[in-house]
């Protein structure tokens, strides 16, 4: 028995590591050092191409909970992180070179893993495979993946607006309404006066943006312009675009506002709302500063900031099962950023689940799902649940399912700790049954 894993990034090494725990051999393909993507520089596995931080260690942060869940499932990424960490306060940061070296050595020393340094241009249809090729998958392999998934279910870049926790919105200023009172009042509206709009506008057009990489320069011309770029065309451009107030009446004044920012429900339970038309390249700190100038969002809690970057990913809700296998090919699994998760640990976590399920598929055992009351389970639930506009998602407490008892707790810190406690109890039980 052998399983093929394509790509030795964070998801790929986790998948390979998880598979070997079942005594199954792995053939791990990695095109480096023969070929590099535009973002990669190191020859080793699990290269951290952006920050060297794996975010917070605190359980009151979803990233902290995700770390603890991953540890319960024998994560090689978490093992490497704690063995190569550098001082970073309450965050877990690593020496990126030692981190990659640690994982590369561990994988290459595993007698069940055969490493092949070659580019894969086609996904085998008749083998059990885990595809974990990342957001910069090569064009030739993407072409084959488009055949597997149908080309309309393949995306080539992110253009995601910020997502806000509904509980953090000030409804003494914001209100529910639909344009022209048509249909149900599905949108949260944040009205602006002329003075408020102009203040927001000038801060928006002068805010710091993320530098555009050479291989991303065409994104601004793909029909999805960042809000700040649109604003630079003229002071009224966005007021006649995503912030147009036509058809909306502020119930407090009985009049149409000068401008309106709308938020649309992002999850079925209505706990998360996305800012309509706010795709952006602003730096995250700038997004928090500038978007909190919007009336009603002064204390907004952003569970995901807006992004626009090159990022190849599949339409997971349409093509993947809850086991992370293709609906059309149950022997082919996907993991990592190519599934539509966002972030280092999020990618690694899906690698663990895909690896476990690929192994159990080979062994003829029932595959596993983690409940959405866990962080890993909530992420997979999010990327495999049908939605109109699927955009990548990172770990956050807003997507984790909670019961009425927890929902009644007003203290946010206490509520998060209770969610974490229940989640880890469930993960511990499942992990003990698996391994």
UniProtKB/Swiss-Prot annotation:
One Gene Ontology cellular component annotation held by this UniProt entry: cytosol
Top-rank taxon: Bacteria
Alphabetical UniProt keywords: Cytoplasm, FAD, Flavoprotein, Methyltransferase, NAD, NADP, Transferase, tRNA processing
Coiled coil: none
Gene Ontology terms, MF aspect: flavin adenine dinucleotide binding; tRNA (uracil(54)-C5)-methyltransferase activity, 5,10-methylenetetrahydrofolate-dependent
Reaction catalyzed: uridine(54) in tRNA + (6R)-5,10-methylene-5,6,7,8-tetrahydrofolate + NADH + H(+) = 5-methyluridine(54) in tRNA + (6S)-5,6,7,8-tetrahydrofolate + NAD(+); uridine(54) in tRNA + (6R)-5,10-methylene-5,6,7,8-tetrahydrofolate + NADPH + H(+) = 5-methyluridine(54) in tRNA + (6S)-5,6,7,8-tetrahydrofolate + NADP(+)
GO biological process: one example: tRNA methylation
Cofactor section: FAD
Enzyme class: transferase
Residues that coordinate or bind FAD: 7-12
EC number: 2.1.1.74
InterPro entries referenced in this protein's UniProt entry, alphabetically: FAD/NAD-bd_sf, MnmG-rel, MnmG-rel_CS, MnmG_N, TrmFO
Compartment annotation: Cytoplasm
The family this protein is said to belong to: Belongs to the MnmG family. TrmFO subfamily.
PANTHER family associated with the record: GLUCOSE INHIBITED DIVISION PROTEIN A, METHYLENETETRAHYDROFOLATE--TRNA-(URACIL-5-)-METHYLTRANSFERASE TRMFO
NCBIfam families: gid_trmFO, PRK05335.1
Function: Catalyzes the folate-dependent formation of 5-methyl-uridine at position 54 (M-5-U54) in all tRNAs.
Name of the molecule in the record: Methylenetetrahydrofolate--tRNA-(uracil-5-)-methyltransferase TrmFO
Organism from which the protein derives: Caldicellulosiruptor saccharolyticus (strain ATCC 43494 / DSM 8903 / Tp8T 6331)
């Amino acid at each position: 028995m052998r399983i093929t894993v394509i790509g030795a990034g964070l998801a790929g090494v986790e998948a390979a590591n998880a598979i070997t725990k079942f005594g199954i051999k792995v053939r791990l393909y990695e095109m480096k050092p023969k070929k590099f993507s535009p973002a990669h520089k190191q020859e080793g596995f699990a290269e951290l191409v952006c920050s060297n931080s794996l975010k917070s260690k605190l359980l009151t942060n979803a990233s902290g909970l995700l770390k603890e869940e991953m540890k319960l499932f024998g994560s090689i990424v978490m093992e490497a992180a704690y063995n190569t960490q550098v001082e970073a306060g309450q965050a877990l940061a690593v020496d990126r070179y030692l981190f990659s070296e640690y994982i590369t050595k561990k994988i290459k020393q595993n007698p069940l893993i055969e490493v092949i340094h070659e580019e894969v241009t086609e996904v085998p249809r008749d083998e059990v495979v885990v595809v974990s090729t990342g957001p910069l998958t090569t064009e030739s392999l993407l072409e084959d993946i488009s055949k597997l998934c149908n080309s309309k279910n393949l995306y080539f870049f992110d253009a995601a607006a910020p997502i806000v926790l509904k509980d953090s919105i000030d409804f003494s200023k914001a209100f529910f309404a639909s344009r022209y009172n048509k249909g149900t009042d599905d949108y949260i509206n944040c009205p602006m006066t002329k003075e408020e709009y102009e203040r927001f506008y000038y801060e928006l057009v002068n805010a710091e943006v993320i530098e555009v990489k050479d291989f991303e320069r065409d994104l601004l011309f793909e029909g999805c312009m960042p809000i700040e770029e649109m604003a630079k065309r003229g002071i009224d451009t966005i007021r006649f675009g995503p912030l147009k107030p036509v058809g909306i009446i502020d119930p407090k004044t009985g009049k149409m506002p000068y401008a309106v920012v709308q938020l649309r429900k992002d999850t079925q339970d209505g706990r998360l709302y996305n800012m309509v038309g706010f795709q952006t390249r602003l730096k995250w700190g700038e997004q928090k500063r500038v978007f909190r100038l919007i009336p009603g969002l002064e204390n907004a809690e952003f569970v995901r900031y807006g992004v626009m970057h090159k990022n190849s990913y599949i339409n997971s809700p349409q093509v993947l099962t809850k086991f992370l296998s293709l609906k059309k090919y149950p022997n082919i699994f996907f993991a990592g950023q190519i599934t539509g998760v966002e972030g280092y640990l999020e990618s690694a976590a899906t690698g663990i689940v895909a690896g476990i399920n690929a192994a159990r598929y080979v062994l003829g055992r029932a595959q596993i799902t983690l409940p959405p009351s866990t962080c890993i389970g909530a992420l997979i639930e999010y990327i495999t649940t049908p939605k109109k506009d699927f955009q990548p998602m990172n770990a956050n407490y807003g997507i984790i399912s909670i019961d009425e008892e927890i929902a009644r707790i007003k203290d946010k810190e206490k509520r998060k700790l209770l969610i974490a406690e229940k989640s880890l109890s469930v993960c511990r039980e499942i992990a003990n049954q698996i391994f």
